[in-house]
From Swiss-Prot:
Its EC number is 2.7.1.107, 2.7.1.138, 2.7.1.94. Lipid kinase that can phosphorylate both monoacylglycerol and diacylglycerol to form lysophosphatidic acid (LPA) and phosphatidic acid (PA), respectively. Phosphorylates ceramide but not sphingosine. Phosphorylates 1,2-dioleoylglycerol more rapidly than 2,3-dioleoylglycerol. Independently of its lipid kinase activity, acts as a component of the TIM22 complex. The TIM22 complex mediates the import and insertion of multi-pass transmembrane proteins into the mitochondrial inner membrane by forming a twin-pore translocase that uses the membrane potential as the external driving force. The gene is agk. CDD domains: GATase1 (cd01653). It comes from Xenopus laevis (African clawed frog). This is Acylglycerol kinase, mitochondrial. The keyword Cell inner membrane does not apply. It is found in: Mitochondrion inner membrane; Mitochondrion intermembrane space. Keywords: ATP-binding, Kinase, Lipid metabolism, Membrane, Mitochondrion, Mitochondrion inner membrane, Nucleotide-binding, Transferase. It is an enzyme of class 2 (transferase). Gene3D superfamilies: Probable inorganic polyphosphate/atp-NAD kinase, domain 1.
Length: 428
């Protein structure tokens, strides 16, 4: 008893040291508990993956091959460690023959995709920029018609993982997010996503699954990291200094666009069986003896292009992938024109909100739906675009919607939500 009293006296006499020690002990306990929970998540994911690996392979069947494009520089250089600790063991236990391709510099994934051999599965381990590079390299291939049918998996390892909100349920824990995404790849459920083809006057086309941004909010967002010392106020500070440097901020251009297009019928997944020999012979003879058909020339109907002059604080052209509707009958991309009549205070407030939700737009924005559009910038225009969070020089571009071009692997529950009506999907 005397010893306990002596301990309490010591803590009372040295209360400053005791407080610091208690805080360190509490933080250390919380850190160790977090590590323990992460290990439990990894173990559960590996046990679930082993169920896939225990399935017997039929005779003369090949092992499923997957090519992983890993960006080690993503997530401030932590992507490689995150992949090797959380995703790689799950893929190995599932019995998949994986080939990991690590990119060393920006743009390398585009070149590697042009040389890639046939694979059963493509996995992108990185962020928005890595996804943009991989799909650009994939769709630039001469045989892109066949390679674009390969399912694509996405493991969110980057600083910005916009696509993960579409493919997987929201998760706060990073380890749980990665392991759940990897397990979703093994389950094989896919969702078709639209792609934007962005073509300049001379350059090769660039492809995006999210969209293109041009304007003041984009310019201010790339400078937020300069004000890291302001902590949670850094986003507001970047937009404040942007407003003080130049106001009003106007981006003028002209845009011509073609309205939404009818969704073509889906191609059957299984090819129809070949008809019997006598049916094929009869068809050939009927075709041979039938008189030649006279083709009546049909004049092509002019496409109803519309034009508009814009003066905006920001322009964005985005796909519908943030909330895809698998039951829609019209295919379109969204063109958001945000008015330049906004006040400085509203500009700073909305800019800070856009850092967490880039798809946020003011209520008075003009929204156009189009299947194709041409953006014409005035000669001498400076600045940059953001295409799926990657920076490109601003120039006049033609943007074409490629509906349901690529198939991404997703979580089964997300697939069920997307197959419901739009109202039910929005409420979930």
């Amino acid at each position: 008893m005397a010893r306990v009293v002596r301990i309490f006296k010591t803590l009372r006499n040295h209360w400053k040291k005791s407080t610091v020690g208690f805080c360190l002990l509490a933080y250390g306990s919380h850190w160790l508990y977090g590590k323990h929970c992460d290990n439990l998540l990894r173990r559960a994911a590996c046990e679930e993956a082993q169920v896939f690996g225990n399935h017997q392979i039929l005779p003369h069947s090949a092992i499923k091959k997957a090519t992983v494009f890993l960006n080690p520089a993503a997530c401030k250089g932590k992507a490689r460690t995150l992949f090797e600790k959380n995703a790689a063991p799950v893929l190995h236990l599932a019995g998949i023959d994986i080939t990991v391709v690590k990119t060393d510099y920006e743009g390398q994934a585009k070149k590697l995709l042009e040389l890639m051999e046939k694979t059963d599965l493509i996995i992108v381990a990185g962020g928005d920029g890595t996804v943009q590079e991989v799909i650009t390299g994939l769709l630039r291939r001469d045989d892109e018609a066949s390679f674009s049918k390969i399912p694509i998996g996405f493991i969110p390892l980057g600083g910005t993982n916009t696509l993960s909100h579409t493919l997987y349920p929201e998760r706060e824990n990073k380890v749980e997010q990665i392991t759940e995404a990897t397990l979703s790849i093994l389950k094989g459920e896919t969702v078709p996503l639209d792609v934007l083809q962005i073509k300049g006057e001379q350059d090769q086309p660039v492809f995006a699954v999210q969209g293109i941004r041009w304007g003041s909010y984009r310019d201010a967002s790339v400078k937020v990291s300069k004000y890291w010392y302001l902590g949670p106020l850094k986003a507001r500070a970047a937009h404040l200094f942007s407003a003080l440097k130049e106001w009003p901020q106007q981006h003028q251009a002209s845009i011509s666009y073609l309205g939404p297009a009818e969704r073509p019928p889906e191609e059957p997944e299984q090819k129809p069986s070949r008809p019997p020999l006598y049916v094929r012979i009869y068809r050939r003879l009927a075709l041979y003896w039938s008189p030649p058909k006279v083709e009546v020339p049909v004049e092509p109907t002019p496409e109803p292009w519309e034009e508009a002059q814009l003066s905006a604080v920001e322009l964005s052209i985005t796909t519908q992938n943030h909330q895809p509707d698998l039951l829609r009958t019209l295919d379109s991309m969204s063109i958001h024109i945000e008015p330049d009549t906004i006040s400085k205070g509203k500009f700073i407030q909305l800019g800070a909100q856009k850092m967490t939700d880039p798809l946020l737009h003011p209520e008075d924005s003009q929204v156009l739906l189009a299947s194709r559009c041409s953006l014409h910038l005035p000669q001498g225009t400076e600045g940059h675009f953001s295409i799926d969070s990657e920076e490109y020089e601003a120039m006049s571009v033609d943007v074409t919607l490629l509906p349901r071009k690529l198939h991404f692997l997703c979580h089964p529950t997300r697939k069920q939500e997307l197959l419901q009506s739009p109202t039910a999907t929005a409420q979930s």
